[in-house]
């Protein structure tokens, strides 16, 4: 049994939760999100909290219901607080700038990389070497941050590239003569 899945997800005041079949909808001050739970997982909304339980005693159902509970908890966090990922750009001449709904990245290529910002995501550039990705959907925020990082992942010799602000880059020594 999943320890995570056993705990009910408490819905704070100011957030309305509805369960329609296998769809869980959350509406809060930051917006509205929904999540479709797998058929092997049973979802109930009672006493101001969402409870998740496996429908069958299979290994698959046991694995999925802890995941479903975590996803529903992310919905509550998203509509109340939101999610944020911070990226740092390291390297000579590497910088970022916003141009309307597009993020322009100068990452050492012969051309600038233009990234279209998807709906529901807000990107701010407080400094030319910092990017903040903010949104209510944790998966979307993480996906956008990962896509931006993939344009120039940090390399281990000089540490140049785009990295998460809390990421540690294992540095290597160069060749010795």
Swiss-Prot record:
SUPFAM superfamilies linked to this entry: Ribosomal protein L6
One CC-aspect GO term: cytosolic large ribosomal subunit
GO biological process: cytoplasmic translation
UniProt entry keywords in alphabetical sequence: Ribonucleoprotein, Ribosomal protein, RNA-binding, rRNA-binding
Annotated Pfam families: Ribosomal_L6
One example GO MF annotation: rRNA binding
Similarity annotation: Belongs to the universal ribosomal protein uL6 family.
Listed NCBIfam families: L6_bact (TIGR03654)
Subunit structure comment from the entry: Part of the 50S ribosomal subunit.
Protein name: Large ribosomal subunit protein uL6
Organism: Rhodopseudomonas palustris (strain BisB5)
Organismal lineage: Bacteria, Pseudomonadati, Pseudomonadota, Alphaproteobacteria, Hyphomicrobiales
Gene name for this UniProt entry: rplF
